UniProtKB/Swiss-Prot annotation:
It comes from Saccharomyces cerevisiae (strain ATCC 204508 / S288c). The modification Phosphoserine is found at residue 272. SUPFAM superfamilies: RNA-binding domain, RBD. GO terms for cellular component: cytosol; mRNA cleavage and polyadenylation specificity factor complex; nucleus. This is Protein PTI1. Disulfide bonds: none annotated.
């Protein structure tokens, strides 16, 4: 038995002297060995790197960095723990081949070479902050451009070379005519699109694709193209809602942006109509209506009281959202007048106010409140869901004669037409 007093190895074979390897675990799932090496570079002389994988899945679970000496390993452990936002676990361990490592360390003529590490795979998106001595040893390279931007550039260059065949871009000329019953409309989007002839729909979609693929396209040009057909605009919005690209809050925000000055306009109209219903009206665009038609329709008298309300009062818009299968309002809110909600509606109120001035002596009510001047009957069940003042206003709008509607500007005719589509059955 060896005399314990002669066993001197216990004085230098300590865990502190044998721990020459750093084990880095708890790696982010998207990190690999190259990324970890790019971060550890500059922490000290590394002579070997080994990956530690899960034996069942083969997934990387850790990386082992073997340093030249245990002192280098301890210094590297202290430096790496000073890295901010470093989402890993760092441990000092004794390598399995510690005897060979000690033998090579003691041999001054050892051929073990120190690895030259770099930061080619440095994770810029992780937001790490390296200590100064690590950056001095191995500088951080300039951040490369994001790959997404490069992909977008390639896609734009590729899209510029796309050429649609004339059979699609000019479908109405080349494809055969549509046969009734060959296309069905099982859902709301298809029902809206079925209002457009199929050849014209193919042509619209092709032109929209061509327009969107242009490199210098502007948002206003796409908006102008979509404004040419309200059914296309509504169908696109419904499709975006179903696919999850937008939600109801986006639709509500867009509708509210179209009625920006509604509260002030509504309060001013209510105040002026309650105090001086006729004298305070100002009109710079006269409305030319034949006197005989005006006198025959006394229902025009109170139109100036609440005409701006349906397009400017927010409570009027969410009601169709509860009734439509996809939560969309009728075409009116999606096709704002060309003059904007802050100009077109006061003009309409003023012009209808002149009709009131011409018929201020008429006080008789309509002969049939549920019957519109044009063909059709007012949908009273739907109309009763609105406040009482809005019910009266919409009834009066629906009783306008075709001649009076034709005398209005085109944008105001569109407003009246939207009411008729919504409340006449």
């Amino acid at each position: 038995m060896t005399d314990p007093r002669r066993r001197t190895g216990r004085h230098f074979l300590t865990p502190e002297n044998l721990s020459s390897t750093l084990q880095i675990t708890n790696l982010p799932p998207e990190w690999n060995q190259d990324i970890i090496t790019s971060v550890v570079a500059g922490s000290g002389p590394v002579i070997d790197i080994k990956a530690k994988n899960d034996p069942r899945t083969g997934k990387l679970t850790g990386v082992l960095f073997d340093y030249l000496t245990s002192k280098d390993c301890k210094r590297a452990w202290e430096i790496l723990n000073r890295i901010e936002n470093f989402p890993v676990k760092i441990e000092q361990i004794i390598p399995p081949n510690y005897k060979d490592h000690l033998r090579e360390t003691a041999n001054k003529n050892s051929q073990k070479q120190v690895l030259q590490l770099n930061r080619d795979s440095y994770p810029f998106e992780a937001g790490l902050e390296l200590p100064f001595e690590m950056v001095t040893e191995v500088p951080i390279p300039r951040r490369p451009p994001p790959p997404q931007a490069a992909n977008n550039t390639n896609s734009v260059s590729n899209n510029t070379n796309i050429q649609f065949p004339d059979i699609l871009s000019k479908a109405s000329k080349h494809l055969p005519s549509f046969q009734d019953g060959s296309i069905i409309a099982p859902d709301k989007i298809s029902q809206n699109l079925s209002k457009i002839p199929p050849l014209q729909l193919i042509e619209i979609i092709s032109n929209l694709k061509i327009l969107s693929n242009q490199e210098n396209i502007q948002k206003s040009q796409l908006e102008s193209f979509l404004d040419t057909n309200s059914d296309i605009t509504i169908s696109v919005t419904q499709a975006l809602l179903e696919m999850g690209f937008i939600d109801y809050s986006v639709v509500t925000k867009v509708l509210k942006s179209q009625v920006g000055e509604a509260p002030s306009l509504l309060s001013s109209n209510n105040t002026s109509n309650s105090n001086t219903p006729v004298s305070v009206i100002r009109n710079n665009t006269p409305l030319h209506v034949p006197s005989n038609e005006v006198s025959n329709n006394p229902n025009n008298m109170p139109l100036n009281v609440a005409m701006p309300m349906p397009m400017s009062t927010p409570p009027f818009i969410p009601l169709p959202l509860q009734q439509q299968p996809f939560g969309f309002a009728p075409p009116g809110p999606f096709m704002p007048p060309a003059q904007g909600p802050s100009m077109g509606q006061p003009v309409l109120a003023n012009q209808l106010g002149q009709v009131q001035q011409q018929n201020i002596s008429s006080t008789e009510g309509p002969s049939n409140a549920n019957k519109a001047n044009d063909s059709g009957t007012i949908n009273m069940a739907k109309l009763q869901l609105l406040p009482e003042n809005q019910q009266d206003m919409i009834k009066q709008v629906l009783t306008l004669t075709p001649a009076q509607i034709q005398s209005l500007p085109s944008d105001q005719q569109l407003m009246v037409e939207n009411f008729r589509k919504e409340y006449i059955i």
